[in-house]
Structures are given as C-alpha cells and as structure tokens.
Amino acid sequence: VQSFEVTEAAVAVFVYMPSAAQPVAPPLDLPKELTDPEWAGFLCTSPWQCNSRYTLDNLVDPMHGCYLHAQSFTLAYGSKQDIMKLDKTQSGFVVSRVAQAGENFDWTEMTFGASTYCRLDLPYPAAAGPGGMFRIIGYVLPVDEHNCTVFFWRLRKCSGLARDSWRFLYRALFEERHWNVLEQDREMLSAMPDDARKREMLYQHDVGVSRIRLVLKQMARDQLAAEDAAAMRSAV
C-alpha cells in the first residue's frame, strides 16, 4: 500500500505526489497569504470538466476578465484594449496589463516549484467596505485528461471591524456573486473541445499563455528525463 506525505493547512489538505526527480516531500511552502494572520479569507473548490491546461491558460490571460465577466460585481470596469507585458520572477513570472492597474483583473503571478499556484488581485467597489483589493490564491489539480479540480482562496488583508464586516458581507452577499463569476469560467472552459488549441489564433494579449505552455512543457521534459534515469539505475 503506497502512502503519501500529507499536511493540513489553510483549511485544506495538501498531499505530496512523489516523482522520480523528488521522491521525498520537500517542506510545504505555502503562499504568504495562507499563513499570515493579517489575511482573512475563504476557500472555494469546484470540480471542472476540462483539462487542467485550459484552466491555467485562462488564469494567465488577464484580458479575459473585462470580456467574459463584464457584467460582474468586480470586473465591470476598465478598458477592453491594452498591451500585456511579462516579467520573470525568481520562481515564475508575472503577466500584467501595461495601461491600467487596479481597475479590473489586471495581472497574474505564477509560481512554480513543488506546487504550482497563481496569485491575482481583483478590485472591490466601495460597496464592499474597507479592506482594499480582493486577492485570489489559486491551485489547479489535474484529475485526468478531461477533468480537474480548482482550489481558490478568496482573501482580503484587513483587521478589526473591517475584517469582521467583510467576512459578514462575504457570507451574506458577495459569495454568491463570486461563485457566479467562477461559473462563467467553468462553463466556458467545459464547453471547449479537446482539440481547441489546433484552431486557436494567439496574439499579443496571450503572452502569458505562451509562457506558461513553455514552462509546463519543460517541466514535463524534466520529469520524463528523471523517470528514464531512475529506470536505468534500477536496471543496473
């Protein structure tokens, strides 16, 4: 019977799936927002009937917010035209809009390592009360070729009365609205055919999509190389 390294944190259970390159689980390195008590939030998770790569493509395409979610509570503002830029980080990259910030879904940061996750901010209108931007930390778990499960922590950095007010408003009013936005993503991605990439036409806004595909392709090559090396060692 195979066992796995399991850690409970941030109201979730993290299971390490060993690989030939990393058979022993490294320390669980969570995003700061999931360990810092100054951040308050809620975890939402949902099974999606689409390949996990479609979900990742969607997350690194900030321009989709002002189109797909144009009638939503948080994403109805800002320009529908812009240029995207990509900046490398020590552990991944950030893709962001050039001409605006803080008006819509304007940037995504991807982090790669023992786990892959994204970080992004959404603007909150004045009706949401004090507390600043609405941050999302997202993980995408592949299930099989046609299914994945998404985990999104919805967070806000606030304290005292602002924290209590936001948590109350989220449960009483905002949660349903945020789920409606997530459903728009799920329905769109679930309706995409498996071979959609064969008919796509990428353009400048898709610089994040192109980048994450290159990263994932290299990660797959490294994994296959590690498995081949492990098989050769076992055969000796």
Kindly give the residue locations of the regions a language model identified:
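Short Fe-S-cluster ligation motifs
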Residues: 1-20
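C-terminal catalytic domain of Rieske-type non-heme iron oxygenases
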Residues: 21-236
